Amino acid sequence: MLNEFKAFIAKGNVMDLAVGVIIGGAFGGIVKSLVDDIIMPIVGAIFGGFDFSNYFLGLSSAVNAPTLAGARAQGAVLAYGSFITVLINFLILAWIIFLMVKGVNTLRAQVERKDNKVAEAAPPPADVQLLTEIRDLLAKR
């Protein structure tokens, strides 16, 4: 059983998945920083300097804090500003992944077209040509 587990872990697919998860986690941090530190301040400057992170709706009358952290300490809140930020993170990440997949698919299609052209352009072997000529001559008789 232990040997089977070792063989399973050593498979390329499992290792590729592990690397993908680790890189994906790091990439998620980069996208979060891009949104939080670059995009959201620009959006805030365009729309009058507001900060999405402190946009919330208190679900009880006891919630009256000016910040999300304070409001959460006072009671339940709908933190729609945080949701907007996470949604923007997701859209950016999805767009980047879409562009990457599209690029890979384009490269694959180009390689396949090139392989097909090479296969079509290659002349048949000499013995096949000879047999084809013999067949054509016999067909004319």
Curated annotation (Swiss-Prot):
It is found in: Cell inner membrane. The chain crosses the membrane at residues 14-34, 38-58, 81-101. It is a multi-pass membrane protein. Gene3D superfamilies: Large-conductance mechanosensitive channel, MscL, domain 1 (1.10.1200.120). Pfam families: MscL. The keyword Nuclease does not apply. It comes from the Bacteria. PROSITE patterns: MSCL. One of its GO terms (molecular function) is mechanosensitive monoatomic ion channel activity. InterPro entries: Mechanosensitive_channel_CS, MS_channel, MSC/AndL, MscL_channel. GO terms for cellular component: plasma membrane. The keyword Ion transport applies. Keywords: Cell inner membrane, Cell membrane, Ion channel, Ion transport, Membrane, Transmembrane, Transmembrane helix, Transport. Channel that opens in response to stretch forces in the membrane lipid bilayer. May participate in the regulation of osmotic pressure changes within the cell. Homopentamer. Belongs to the MscL family. This is Large-conductance mechanosensitive channel. It comes from Rhizobium rhizogenes (strain K84 / ATCC BAA-868). The gene is mscL.
